[in-house]
Amino acid sequence: MSRTLFVTTALPYANGSFHIGHIMEYIQADIWVRSMRMAGHTVHFVGADDAHGAPIMLKAEKEGITPQALVARYAAERPRYLDGFHIRFDHWHSTDSAENVALSHEIYRALKAAGLIETRSIEQFFDPVKGMFLADRYIKGECPRCHAKDQYGDSCEVCGAVYAPTELIQPYSALTGATPVLKRSDHFFFKLSDPRCVEFLQQWTTGSNRNGIKHLQSEVQAKTREWLGGEEGEAKLGDWDISRDAPYFGIEIPDAPGKYFYVWLDAPVGYLASLKSYCDKIGLDFDALLDPSSATEQVHFIGKDIIYFHALFWPAMLKFAGRKTPDALNVHGFITVSGEKMSKSRGTGISPLRYLEVGMDPEWLRYYMAAKLNARVEDMDFNPEDFIARVNSDLVGKYVNIASRAANFITRHFEGKLAYLGDTAALSAEFAQQTESIRAALEAREFNRAIREIMAYADGINQAFDAAQPWVLAKGFAEADEARRAQLQDICSRALAGFKALSVMLAPVLPALTSRVARDLFGAQRDFIWSDAADLPAQVAPFKHLMQRVDPQMLDALFEPPAELAAPAPTPGGEALADTISIDDFVKVDLRIAKIINCEEVEGSTKLLRLTLDAGEGRHRNVFSGIKSFYKPQDLIGKLTVLVANLAPRKMKFGVSEGMVLAASHADEKVDAGIYVLEPWPGAQPGMRIH
């Protein structure tokens, strides 16, 4: 039965060019969309630029241009990347559009009418020079715990402490250097903690769509249980501040002059705005297409770093605005290079534009990513040696090799005509069965399984061809009898029919190459669809070169050379290194190995865990740590960690903290939102001092 699908990828933020992570997500979605279309389904595949927010406003101001001009500059780059990698969106739009304004207003008004918008007066730091309220990332100061300088307004990168911006010592604006002042402002909150939202999300996150497809992968569902609680657990959802004060580049909130939607509210609405723009363009009824009762399936491809917004806020917003909720979130991991996080300074950064500029085939990358991606939330590793081997061995050595060998015999001896001995029904059925297995794997997003099956099938075709030894039959062809000629023609015809079937299987992954195969080699008038695999070809044109091998020197050119040691990255971890200290200063800090004897949540705190530590002193210490968002208490019990043992005890609202455990985090949550508690290597014992 034919299905109708509305498919999106996460919206790229319009203050920079595409990076390889964007391209990976777009290729994954594009392969899936092409596969669904080949099955006869109707797919509306749209994207857009995420064009609002303070970072865009401030970057444009720094460059002396308008935010719209900055967004337009990056929007103009998009086709070069998308076309370059054969990524075929139906429509590309912007959140800075009339459609997005109208839809954001409609959704907000519906949520307000449902009693899910609440106004609260909050106190924030305000930059008197800039004349704007400051987000945490734009406030710096001295950490109230370890007294490290130049720490951001919500957490310390040195000691891992989490705090409110008002707790910073000598805070200053990262924009102007001015001392911020506290100022009150009315903000609008979406009441995600409302029992109606909690009940809906507990059902939606564990549910399936009308086709029985789970809304969430098992890993994502498990993550949402941490926020929603299980059957016996209590939900830990906080209400969401959806407003920002002027000056702000965004969509003004209805009936609230000087108040704007926070970018994370109008950004996902941009999915709908892009579809609305596309529907208006081609004459489709947008409202009917996305009516809650319609059969349209709404599918979002996103990265694992934005699960919270897409699995909680987004479906709840849509549900209580009376709109269709998502049918599936397809979440993927990050991309690494040779097992490491990409880094320009280490020469492991991949620029998608550079990939194209050095002359590398975009379909090499599409194939390689398909060979590595699956339906789980796993990181994909790009290994240069593996990349070369897979392309040269699989695509050229196995797949293309079939056509180049068999077609030459057919064109030289049979004028391009194919003929088969015996009953061909079994051969057609075999192709149909194998192709259906590939189609199902691609629909399930098990791309790596599909590629393994395709290459195993190619191995079988090559082995059968080699075993038949057509080059022996071709010797003395002019004097050969009809039986021998027919046998040669049959062997090569079957190999080429197999090559055609393989091309159908690979069509979603290699759209440009398989289009040439369909049209130039087999004389088709259109690109392949799944059912074409079972139709045995009757004629081929002379073989033309299809794909070159990867030259290892291309990989050398792809990776940017490591930065000179004399010029390291100025802000590792998102911030500059602290001032140099002497060894005498360092030894004043007593760092000890400590074992976590117990760990529990702190009632009344959304950030803190209470750790009971054994530091080899014959007694236990009580330490509070702001790591609740990233660790379950039961997962920490029994672990070793690092304790600042001689830090003066600090009296807190919840008790006395007798030291500090060390943790690492990045200054910019958009780069890495995690907090990582330090854990010594096995063998270290509680009480050992770190030197």
UniProtKB/Swiss-Prot annotation:
Residue window of motif 'KMSKS' region: 341-345
SUPFAM superfamilies listed in its UniProt record: Anticodon-binding domain of a subclass of class I aminoacyl-tRNA synthetases, Methionyl-tRNA synthetase (MetRS), Zn-domain, Nucleic acid-binding proteins, Nucleotidylyl transferase
Position of sequence motif 'HIGH' region: 12-22
Keywords tagged on the record: Aminoacyl-tRNA synthetase, ATP-binding, Cytoplasm, Ligase, Metal-binding, Nucleotide-binding, Protein biosynthesis, RNA-binding, tRNA-binding, Zinc
UniProt GO BP: methionyl-tRNA aminoacylation
Cofactor: how bound: Binds 1 zinc ion per subunit.
Location in or out of the cell: Cytoplasm
Enzyme Commission code(s) on record: 6.1.1.10
Cofactor (UniProt): Zn(2+)
Residue sites binding Zn(2+) per the record: C143, C146, C156, C159
Gene Ontology molecular functions: ATP binding; metal ion binding; methionine-tRNA ligase activity; tRNA binding
Transmembrane among keywords: no
Residues in tRNA-binding domain copies: 585-691
Cellular component aspect of the GO annotation: cytosol
Superkingdom of the organism of origin: Bacteria
Function in brief: Is required not only for elongation of protein synthesis but also for the initiation of all mRNA translation through initiator tRNA(fMet) aminoacylation.
Family recorded in the similarity comment: Belongs to the class-I aminoacyl-tRNA synthetase family. MetG type 1 subfamily.
Assembly and binders: Homodimer.
Cited HAMAP family: Met_tRNA_synth_type1
Protein's recorded name: Methionine--tRNA ligase
Organism the protein comes from: Bordetella avium (strain 197N)
Gene expressing this chain: metG
